[in-house]
């Protein structure tokens, strides 16, 4: 570092005299790369962090294509290998990258609440991920189709959902970022809500344990 080699300017704003608000303003943060920047702004934590952004930006591969990596055709395998360089396995690539993204958000705003919404890709969006076309149905209206909570408890997606749960456990239990909370999207019925809570518990994310809160979007 060479002192005074380049000119630069610093802009600062004082927020010390701002009045207290009668409510808590939480942020929507999607990009972990900006988390520490946004954490410097006045805030009460993160009200919504979408897992889809992390999957799209940091992974880019359909989870089923990774779980069934050995069954993919050679060209697709090579494409996936390029994306997962530095990771021991396709599974670890998915879980590790999710963990990195979630933990970055949790650490940036710690100890404030960070509500992370589990994946809510629509079928056409999952199909756009590398290897995704093979595993997704063609739906008339994906907005109301196979998405959110309904995926988590389906036999065709349950083990993919387990990867998200593993990442969340690493963030909360191994890294100690217990300020990270779970949001379940697109819950359609009470029975579905109950089934997802039970599935989360089977995956090691029990409501109330280690202070875990589970929030749901009922749509």
Write out the residue ranges for each language-model feature:
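Small/polar beta-strand repeat architecture
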Residues: 8-12
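Conserved alpha/beta-domain cores
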Residues: 13-219
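Conformationally flexible catalytic loops at phosphate/diphosphate-handling active centers
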Residues: 1
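Beta-strand/loop-dominated core regions that host nucleotide or nucleotide-derived cofactor-binding catalytic loops
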Residues: 5
